Amino acid sequence: MINTSFAGLKLVSPIIVGSNSQTANIQKIVEFEKAGAGAIVLKSLFEESIMREISSLGNDDHPEAYDYLSGYVSEKVVTDYLALIAEAKKRCTIPIIPSIACHSDGKWEEFAKRMQGAGADALELNVMSLSTSRVYKDGDFERIHYKIVENVVKLVNIPVIVKIGSNHSNITSLCDGLYARGAKAVVLFNRLFPTDIDVDRLTFTIGQALTSPADLSLPLRWAGIVSASVPQIDIAVSGGVDSWKGIAKSILSGAKAVEVASAIIREGASWITNANKLLEEWQQSKGFNAPENYLGNMNAAEPENEDKLLRTQFLKYFSEIH
């Protein structure tokens, strides 16, 4: 069997369908459950998009009208999202996890309680931000994460999951701090908007939107390190899982689950069914009855593994193969 648990939720599979455009579609959500998904993360409610819609209204001439319309815009977006949560819970039995993509603490935190009321099984906070200021006090970036989690945990009693970026100086310390403030799990890692440049038109374009297997290396490394250092917080790997092997690698590194979007977008819901089948066959061939039997077997808790995971230079590697 491939049953597991993550953030206190029971999953029939370690495959969590990650937030993407398809998880805003109730028919697709039902299809993913039938294919064998362990849980669904709904398409993120973007703090940024709500604020942008409000800003586009303008408020120079009629401030009272602006206040009314801005309230309507944000309420409409949130109400539609709450309806999606309720419908998904009505149609599915697996955990439904709404996602808020945010970069600051503020009014949006009130949405969290309403999502819980709509039936959410857990809440994913996708903290997306870049720290680029020259005037920067050490730890400010991390403190934003802590404040967001503290505020949300006060409002809900469902598990809070935090999806973080890889752009932190000490990811282990951040995960430890998030757990201390009430987070039940972390997802390693979110992905910033991919930017590219068209050298003919001299314009910005969208870079590679979907992940590839090469993207798996970084979250694997940190899953192996964090699961050994902060074993009390659950981990999910996100980015680069394109086959059952990526799932097995993630669990061996210490992740209890994986969030997958790109592979499912490319291949459809059948990818979930096939990956589940092949993962279970591999488990049986290795003598494992369930993911918990090999969870973290290759994390940094073993000195031999720690040496490999903490290696940052290529020199020793090349000297071994030449």
Describe these PLM feature segments.
Residues 10-16, 70-71, 159-160:
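Short, basic, glycine/proline-bearing loop/turn elements
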Residues 19-23:
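Glycine-rich phosphate/pyrophosphate-binding beta-alpha loops
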Residues 266-286, 292-322:
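C-terminal extensions of enzymes
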Residues 25-60, 79-86, 90-97, 101-237, ...:
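Alpha/beta enzyme core
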Residues 235, 290-291:
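Acidic/polar loop patches that form or flank catalytic/metal-binding clefts of enzymes
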Residues 1, 63-68, 77, 83:
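Macrodomain-like recognition of ADP-ribose-binding/processing modules
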Residues 1-18, 81-89:
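N-terminal amphipathic alpha-helix/helix-capping segment at the start of soluble metabolic enzymes
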Residues 56-72:
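Active-site gating loops and adjacent loop-to-helix segments of metal-dependent hydrolytic enzymes
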